[in-house]
Swiss-Prot record:
Organism of origin: Rattus norvegicus (Rat)
A molecular function (GO) term: DNA-binding transcription repressor activity, RNA polymerase II-specific
Superkingdom to which the source organism belongs: Eukaryota
Name of protein: Paired box protein Pax-4
Function in brief: Plays an important role in the differentiation and development of pancreatic islet beta cells. Transcriptional repressor that competes with PAX6 in binding to a common element in the glucagon, insulin and somatostatin promoters.
Region feature (Transcription repression): 278-349
Subcellular location per the Swiss-Prot or TrEMBL entry: Nucleus
Region spans: PAI subdomain: 8-64
Region (RED subdomain): 83-131
Protein backbone atom coordinates (compact mmCIF):
# COMPACT_ATOMS: atom_id res chain seq x y z
CA UNK A 1 0.00 0.00 0.00
CA UNK A 2 1.48 3.32 -1.07
CA UNK A 3 0.90 6.68 0.56
CA UNK A 4 1.81 9.90 -1.29
CA UNK A 5 4.13 7.87 -3.48
CA UNK A 6 6.87 7.98 -0.80
CA UNK A 7 5.99 5.96 2.29
CA UNK A 8 4.87 2.37 2.53
CA UNK A 9 3.18 0.34 5.25
CA UNK A 10 4.65 -2.95 6.38
CA UNK A 11 2.75 -5.99 7.64
CA UNK A 12 2.77 -4.66 11.20
CA UNK A 13 1.28 -1.31 10.22
CA UNK A 14 4.45 0.72 10.50
CA UNK A 15 5.52 3.32 7.97
CA UNK A 16 8.84 3.13 6.13
CA UNK A 17 10.46 4.76 3.11
CA UNK A 18 11.64 2.26 0.55
CA UNK A 19 15.42 2.37 0.04
CA UNK A 20 16.04 4.51 3.12
CA UNK A 21 17.46 3.30 6.47
CA UNK A 22 15.55 3.56 9.73
CA UNK A 23 15.93 6.81 11.63
CA UNK A 24 18.60 6.93 14.30
CA UNK A 25 16.12 7.29 17.19
CA UNK A 26 14.33 4.09 16.12
CA UNK A 27 17.65 2.28 16.00
CA UNK A 28 18.50 3.46 19.49
CA UNK A 29 15.14 2.21 20.80
CA UNK A 30 15.79 -1.20 19.24
CA UNK A 31 19.17 -1.45 20.98
CA UNK A 32 17.83 -0.24 24.32
CA UNK A 33 14.99 -2.77 24.29
CA UNK A 34 17.42 -5.54 23.36
CA UNK A 35 19.69 -4.57 26.27
CA UNK A 36 16.72 -4.84 28.63
CA UNK A 37 16.28 -8.42 27.48
CA UNK A 38 13.38 -8.13 25.07
CA UNK A 39 13.35 -10.62 22.24
CA UNK A 40 13.69 -9.39 18.63
CA UNK A 41 10.20 -10.59 17.75
CA UNK A 42 8.71 -8.59 20.66
CA UNK A 43 10.72 -5.52 19.64
CA UNK A 44 9.39 -5.90 16.11
CA UNK A 45 5.77 -5.92 17.26
CA UNK A 46 6.31 -3.10 19.75
CA UNK A 47 7.98 -0.66 17.34
CA UNK A 48 6.12 -1.94 14.23
CA UNK A 49 9.43 -2.66 12.47
CA UNK A 50 9.93 -5.83 10.46
CA UNK A 51 11.65 -8.69 12.22
CA UNK A 52 14.37 -8.90 9.56
CA UNK A 53 15.28 -5.26 9.97
CA UNK A 54 15.53 -5.61 13.76
CA UNK A 55 17.71 -8.72 13.46
CA UNK A 56 20.09 -7.04 10.99
CA UNK A 57 20.50 -3.93 13.12
CA UNK A 58 21.16 -5.93 16.29
CA UNK A 59 23.53 -8.33 14.53
CA UNK A 60 25.60 -5.50 13.12
CA UNK A 61 25.64 -3.75 16.49
CA UNK A 62 26.84 -6.86 18.31
CA UNK A 63 29.49 -7.50 15.67
CA UNK A 64 30.95 -4.03 15.17
CA UNK A 65 29.40 -1.84 17.85
CA UNK A 66 28.22 0.60 15.17
CA UNK A 67 24.65 1.85 15.25
CA UNK A 68 24.69 4.35 12.39
CA UNK A 69 23.61 3.16 8.96
CA UNK A 70 26.07 2.63 6.14
CA UNK A 71 26.55 5.06 3.30
CA UNK A 72 23.46 5.79 1.27
CA UNK A 73 23.91 5.94 -2.48
CA UNK A 74 26.81 7.64 -4.21
CA UNK A 75 30.21 6.09 -4.78
CA UNK A 76 31.62 3.74 -2.21
CA UNK A 77 34.45 5.35 -0.25
CA UNK A 78 37.84 3.87 -1.01
CA UNK A 79 39.04 1.87 1.95
CA UNK A 80 42.42 0.93 0.47
CA UNK A 81 44.00 4.34 0.92
CA UNK A 82 47.66 4.89 -0.04
CA UNK A 83 48.70 4.50 3.60
CA UNK A 84 46.82 1.20 3.88
CA UNK A 85 48.29 -0.06 0.59
CA UNK A 86 51.80 0.83 1.74
CA UNK A 87 51.28 -1.02 5.01
CA UNK A 88 49.90 -4.07 3.16
CA UNK A 89 52.99 -4.15 0.95
CA UNK A 90 55.26 -3.80 3.99
CA UNK A 91 53.53 -6.63 5.85
CA UNK A 92 53.68 -8.92 2.82
CA UNK A 93 57.36 -8.12 2.34
CA UNK A 94 58.22 -8.82 5.99
CA UNK A 95 55.97 -11.88 6.32
CA UNK A 96 55.40 -13.49 2.89
CA UNK A 97 53.30 -16.31 4.38
CA UNK A 98 50.59 -13.99 5.72
CA UNK A 99 47.06 -14.53 4.44
CA UNK A 100 44.75 -11.70 3.42
CA UNK A 101 42.52 -12.10 6.46
CA UNK A 102 45.57 -11.96 8.74
CA UNK A 103 46.65 -8.72 7.07
CA UNK A 104 43.12 -7.36 7.57
CA UNK A 105 43.23 -8.22 11.27
CA UNK A 106 46.67 -6.64 11.63
CA UNK A 107 45.48 -3.41 10.00
CA UNK A 108 42.62 -3.17 12.48
CA UNK A 109 44.93 -3.98 15.41
CA UNK A 110 47.33 -1.20 14.40
CA UNK A 111 44.48 1.32 14.15
CA UNK A 112 44.97 2.16 10.48
CA UNK A 113 41.30 1.40 9.85
CA UNK A 114 38.27 0.51 11.94
CA UNK A 115 36.46 -2.80 11.91
CA UNK A 116 33.65 -1.58 9.65
CA UNK A 117 35.90 0.40 7.33
CA UNK A 118 38.69 -2.13 6.85
CA UNK A 119 39.37 -3.31 3.29
CA UNK A 120 37.82 -6.66 2.49
CA UNK A 121 39.80 -9.84 1.93
CA UNK A 122 39.18 -9.68 -1.82
CA UNK A 123 40.36 -6.06 -1.88
CA UNK A 124 43.59 -7.01 -0.08
CA UNK A 125 44.16 -9.87 -2.54
CA UNK A 126 43.66 -7.41 -5.40
CA UNK A 127 46.27 -5.10 -3.91
CA UNK A 128 48.72 -7.99 -3.53
CA UNK A 129 48.24 -9.07 -7.15
CA UNK A 130 48.82 -5.51 -8.33
CA UNK A 131 52.04 -5.33 -6.30
CA UNK A 132 53.28 -8.59 -7.83
CA UNK A 133 52.58 -7.33 -11.34
CA UNK A 134 54.48 -4.12 -10.62
CA UNK A 135 57.49 -6.05 -9.33
CA UNK A 136 57.46 -8.39 -12.35
CA UNK A 137 57.34 -5.42 -14.73
CA UNK A 138 60.20 -3.75 -12.85
CA UNK A 139 62.44 -6.83 -13.10
CA UNK A 140 61.57 -7.26 -16.77
CA UNK A 141 62.72 -3.73 -17.49
CA UNK A 142 65.95 -4.27 -15.56
CA UNK A 143 66.76 -7.54 -17.38
CA UNK A 144 66.04 -6.21 -20.86
CA UNK A 145 69.04 -6.18 -23.29
CA UNK A 146 71.18 -3.14 -22.62
CA UNK A 147 72.86 -2.99 -26.00
CA UNK A 148 70.08 -2.57 -28.50
CA UNK A 149 70.48 -0.64 -31.72
CA UNK A 150 68.75 -0.60 -35.09
CA UNK A 151 70.34 -2.40 -38.02
CA UNK A 152 73.05 -0.59 -39.94
CA UNK A 153 71.76 1.31 -42.97
CA UNK A 154 72.64 -0.08 -46.38
CA UNK A 155 74.79 1.90 -48.84
CA UNK A 156 71.76 2.48 -51.09
CA UNK A 157 69.54 3.80 -48.34
CA UNK A 158 69.75 7.35 -49.70
CA UNK A 159 67.96 6.47 -52.92
CA UNK A 160 65.25 4.33 -51.37
CA UNK A 161 62.35 5.40 -49.27
CA UNK A 162 62.40 3.96 -45.74
CA UNK A 163 60.05 1.08 -45.30
CA UNK A 164 58.05 0.96 -42.10
CA UNK A 165 56.95 -2.25 -40.43
CA UNK A 166 53.86 -3.92 -41.73
CA UNK A 167 50.75 -3.19 -39.71
CA UNK A 168 50.03 -5.85 -37.13
CA UNK A 169 53.63 -7.18 -37.04
CA UNK A 170 56.26 -6.50 -34.40
CA UNK A 171 59.98 -6.43 -35.24
CA UNK A 172 62.68 -6.95 -32.64
CA UNK A 173 65.87 -4.94 -32.81
CA UNK A 174 69.01 -6.94 -33.45
CA UNK A 175 71.70 -6.92 -30.78
CA UNK A 176 74.96 -5.47 -32.10
CA UNK A 177 78.03 -6.99 -30.44
CA UNK A 178 81.33 -5.18 -30.24
CA UNK A 179 84.46 -6.94 -31.55
CA UNK A 180 85.61 -7.67 -27.99
CA UNK A 181 82.27 -9.17 -27.04
CA UNK A 182 82.12 -11.29 -30.19
CA UNK A 183 85.68 -12.55 -29.62
CA UNK A 184 84.96 -13.51 -26.01
CA UNK A 185 81.77 -15.32 -26.95
CA UNK A 186 83.44 -17.19 -29.80
CA UNK A 187 86.37 -18.22 -27.61
CA UNK A 188 84.00 -19.63 -24.99
CA UNK A 189 82.03 -21.43 -27.71
CA UNK A 190 85.19 -23.15 -28.93
CA UNK A 191 85.82 -24.28 -25.36
CA UNK A 192 82.30 -25.68 -24.89
CA UNK A 193 79.05 -25.39 -26.83
CA UNK A 194 76.79 -25.85 -23.79
CA UNK A 195 77.97 -23.56 -20.97
CA UNK A 196 76.29 -23.88 -17.59
CA UNK A 197 74.74 -21.04 -15.61
CA UNK A 198 78.00 -20.25 -13.79
CA UNK A 199 79.95 -19.88 -17.03
CA UNK A 200 77.15 -17.81 -18.57
CA UNK A 201 77.14 -15.52 -15.54
CA UNK A 202 80.90 -14.97 -15.71
CA UNK A 203 80.74 -14.39 -19.46
CA UNK A 204 77.86 -11.93 -19.05
CA UNK A 205 79.83 -10.00 -16.42
CA UNK A 206 82.96 -9.98 -18.59
CA UNK A 207 81.14 -8.77 -21.71
CA UNK A 208 78.62 -6.46 -19.95
CA UNK A 209 75.75 -8.34 -21.60
CA UNK A 210 72.58 -9.73 -20.00
CA UNK A 211 72.67 -13.45 -19.33
CA UNK A 212 69.59 -13.97 -21.52
CA UNK A 213 71.44 -12.42 -24.45
CA UNK A 214 74.41 -14.75 -23.87
CA UNK A 215 72.13 -17.78 -23.77
CA UNK A 216 70.40 -16.77 -27.02
CA UNK A 217 73.77 -16.16 -28.69
CA UNK A 218 74.96 -19.69 -27.83
CA UNK A 219 71.72 -21.19 -29.13
CA UNK A 220 72.05 -19.36 -32.45
CA UNK A 221 75.75 -20.22 -32.68
CA UNK A 222 75.04 -23.94 -32.21
CA UNK A 223 72.45 -23.83 -34.99
CA UNK A 224 74.96 -22.11 -37.27
CA UNK A 225 77.62 -24.73 -36.42
CA UNK A 226 75.24 -27.57 -37.32
CA UNK A 227 74.49 -25.99 -40.69
CA UNK A 228 78.19 -25.58 -41.42
CA UNK A 229 78.99 -29.18 -40.50
CA UNK A 230 76.18 -30.52 -42.65
CA UNK A 231 77.35 -28.45 -45.63
CA UNK A 232 80.93 -29.66 -45.13
CA UNK A 233 79.89 -33.31 -45.17
CA UNK A 234 77.78 -32.83 -48.27
CA UNK A 235 80.68 -31.08 -50.01
CA UNK A 236 83.26 -33.75 -49.12
CA UNK A 237 81.03 -36.73 -50.02
CA UNK A 238 78.65 -35.81 -52.84
CA UNK A 239 77.62 -39.45 -53.35
CA UNK A 240 76.74 -40.15 -49.73
CA UNK A 241 73.03 -40.05 -50.44
CA UNK A 242 73.21 -42.81 -53.05
CA UNK A 243 73.16 -46.50 -52.09
CA UNK A 244 76.19 -48.51 -53.02
CA UNK A 245 75.63 -50.91 -55.92
CA UNK A 246 78.01 -53.90 -55.87
CA UNK A 247 77.84 -56.57 -58.62
CA UNK A 248 76.84 -60.02 -57.53
CA UNK A 249 79.97 -61.58 -59.02
CA UNK A 250 82.35 -59.31 -57.13
CA UNK A 251 84.72 -60.85 -54.55
CA UNK A 252 83.35 -61.28 -51.09
CA UNK A 253 79.73 -61.72 -52.26
CA UNK A 254 77.92 -65.03 -51.93
CA UNK A 255 74.79 -65.38 -54.00
CA UNK A 256 71.64 -67.09 -52.84
CA UNK A 257 71.92 -69.74 -55.56
CA UNK A 258 75.30 -70.99 -54.28
CA UNK A 259 75.24 -73.96 -51.97
CA UNK A 260 77.14 -73.79 -48.67
CA UNK A 261 79.68 -76.34 -49.94
CA UNK A 262 80.49 -74.31 -53.06
CA UNK A 263 81.58 -71.12 -51.32
CA UNK A 264 84.35 -69.56 -53.44
CA UNK A 265 87.67 -68.86 -51.83
CA UNK A 266 87.42 -65.20 -52.91
CA UNK A 267 84.62 -64.71 -50.41
CA UNK A 268 86.60 -66.01 -47.47
CA UNK A 269 89.00 -63.04 -47.01
CA UNK A 270 86.03 -60.83 -46.24
CA UNK A 271 84.82 -63.27 -43.60
CA UNK A 272 88.32 -63.75 -42.19
CA UNK A 273 88.60 -60.05 -41.55
CA UNK A 274 85.54 -60.17 -39.33
CA UNK A 275 85.50 -61.06 -35.70
CA UNK A 276 85.04 -64.86 -35.22
CA UNK A 277 82.02 -64.19 -33.05
CA UNK A 278 80.49 -62.18 -35.89
CA UNK A 279 81.04 -65.03 -38.33
CA UNK A 280 79.72 -67.49 -35.81
CA UNK A 281 76.48 -65.49 -35.65
CA UNK A 282 76.08 -65.29 -39.40
CA UNK A 283 77.43 -68.66 -40.56
CA UNK A 284 77.30 -70.90 -37.49
CA UNK A 285 81.08 -71.51 -37.66
CA UNK A 286 84.30 -69.57 -37.92
CA UNK A 287 85.89 -69.16 -41.40
CA UNK A 288 88.64 -71.77 -40.95
CA UNK A 289 86.03 -74.44 -40.32
CA UNK A 290 83.86 -73.39 -43.22
CA UNK A 291 86.74 -73.01 -45.69
CA UNK A 292 87.23 -76.73 -46.13
CA UNK A 293 85.49 -78.53 -48.95
CA UNK A 294 84.19 -81.19 -46.58
CA UNK A 295 82.01 -78.77 -44.67
CA UNK A 296 78.61 -80.28 -44.11
CA UNK A 297 75.26 -78.60 -44.40
CA UNK A 298 75.07 -78.41 -40.59
CA UNK A 299 78.12 -76.15 -40.54
CA UNK A 300 76.12 -73.22 -41.89
CA UNK A 301 73.06 -71.63 -40.30
CA UNK A 302 70.55 -69.59 -42.30
CA UNK A 303 70.67 -65.86 -41.86
CA UNK A 304 67.04 -65.51 -40.81
CA UNK A 305 67.76 -67.52 -37.65
CA UNK A 306 70.17 -64.91 -36.29
CA UNK A 307 69.32 -61.69 -38.14
CA UNK A 308 68.18 -59.93 -34.96
CA UNK A 309 71.71 -60.16 -33.54
CA UNK A 310 73.44 -58.38 -36.44
CA UNK A 311 73.77 -54.62 -36.89
CA UNK A 312 71.87 -53.35 -39.90
CA UNK A 313 72.14 -49.85 -41.37
CA UNK A 314 71.92 -48.10 -44.69
CA UNK A 315 75.09 -47.22 -46.51
CA UNK A 316 74.39 -43.51 -46.75
CA UNK A 317 73.82 -43.12 -43.02
CA UNK A 318 76.82 -45.21 -41.97
CA UNK A 319 79.16 -43.52 -44.43
CA UNK A 320 78.07 -40.15 -43.08
CA UNK A 321 78.33 -41.10 -39.41
CA UNK A 322 81.37 -43.42 -39.48
CA UNK A 323 83.59 -42.82 -42.55
CA UNK A 324 86.10 -45.43 -41.30
CA UNK A 325 83.57 -48.21 -41.83
CA UNK A 326 82.82 -49.75 -45.20
CA UNK A 327 79.56 -51.33 -46.20
CA UNK A 328 79.00 -54.52 -48.17
CA UNK A 329 75.62 -55.56 -49.49
CA UNK A 330 74.85 -59.17 -48.66
CA UNK A 331 73.00 -61.03 -51.41
CA UNK A 332 72.60 -64.35 -49.64
CA UNK A 333 69.80 -65.48 -47.35
CA UNK A 334 68.51 -61.98 -46.55
CA UNK A 335 65.17 -61.95 -44.76
CA UNK A 336 64.47 -65.52 -45.74
CA UNK A 337 64.12 -67.22 -49.12
CA UNK A 338 62.44 -65.35 -51.94
CA UNK A 339 63.08 -61.77 -50.71
CA UNK A 340 65.15 -59.20 -52.53
CA UNK A 341 68.45 -58.17 -50.94
CA UNK A 342 68.45 -54.56 -49.77
CA UNK A 343 70.39 -54.59 -46.51
CA UNK A 344 74.02 -53.68 -45.87
CA UNK A 345 76.38 -55.14 -43.28
CA UNK A 346 79.38 -53.41 -41.82
CA UNK A 347 82.89 -54.62 -41.06
CA UNK A 348 86.12 -52.89 -40.31
CA UNK A 349 88.44 -52.50 -43.33
Amino acid sequence: MQQDGLSSVNQLGGLFVNGRPLPLDTRQQIVQLAIRGMRPCDISRSLKVSNGCVSKILGRYYRTGVLEPKGIGGSKPRLATPAVVARIAQLKDEYPALFAWEIQRQLCAEGLCTQDKAPSVSSINRVLRALQEDQRLHWTQLRSPAVLAPALPSPHSNCEAPRGPHPGTSHRNRTIFSPGQAEALEKEFQRGQYPDSVVRGKLAAATSLPEDTVRVWFSNRRAKWRRQEKLKWETQMPGASQDLMVPKDSPGIISAQQSPGSVPSAALPVLEQLNPSFCQLCWGAVPDRCSSDTTSQACLQPYWECHSLLPVASSSYMEFAWPCLTTHPVHHLIGGPGQAPSTYYLHWP
